[in-house]
Amino acid sequence: MSNLQEQLIALGGVFQAAVLVDRIARTGQASEANIGCMLGSLLVRDPKDTLEVFGGDDLNLRDGYRALVGALERDPSSLQREPLRYALSMLGLERQLNKRGDLLDTIGNRLPQIQSQAEHFGLVHENVIASSGALYQDTLSTLRQRIQVHGDMRFLQQASNASKIRALLLAGIRAARLWRQLGGHRWQLVFSRRKLLNELYDMMRTPS
């Protein structure tokens, strides 16, 4: 697997989280498998490659790939505006987080507790989602930049949905961190757009 493919898998994770946040905000619904994939990515330590972070394949990242393609193609008919806004906000928040060793320490110290909960209850159990959401609230929500989520207030006001959204934002920012560690940079989205698209088209044609 090339470094560019590894980067695109990680960036696909950012956009997948963004798509799921938008879906929950607008409809109150999202696939458990998709949510589980993103929450699981928070708990993977020392993966052998980027795919292992997301469960060993990219089946649950395909919606993220499509949203990323829509952003890179700049086609108004395929552009998913809110997911793009959330994804870019997560990339920005990750850069802020990288300067805050105290918050990184808090995240590192609390993830093992969430890991224990996940082993006991399962990845998509409400306790695991609530703990992941609380970790986002106690760390990333304290930064100057905040992500404003738009949607249907009937769904946004439900505590379980709010926790899912925060947990997914945390997972998306973890994917953004991975993308940057692999050499990803926001300028690529502007100046290497065609190269990224060609690689993404190939990845989306390949069965998971």
Curated annotation (Swiss-Prot):
Mainly resides where?
Answer: cytoplasm
UniProt xrefs under InterPro entries: HflD, HflD-like_sf
Question: Which compartments does it reside in?
Answer: Cytoplasm; Cell inner membrane
What keywords tag this UniProt record?
Cell inner membrane, Cell membrane, Cytoplasm, Membrane
Q: Does the keyword Electron transport apply?
A: no
Entry's Gene3D superfamilies? HflD-like
Q: Topology with regard to the membrane?
A: Peripheral membrane protein
* Gene Ontology terms: cellular component: cytoplasm; plasma membrane
The domain of life is: Bacteria
Which family, according to UniProt?
Answer: Belongs to the HflD family.
**What name goes with this protein?**
High frequency lysogenization protein HflD homolog
Gene expressing this chain:
hflD
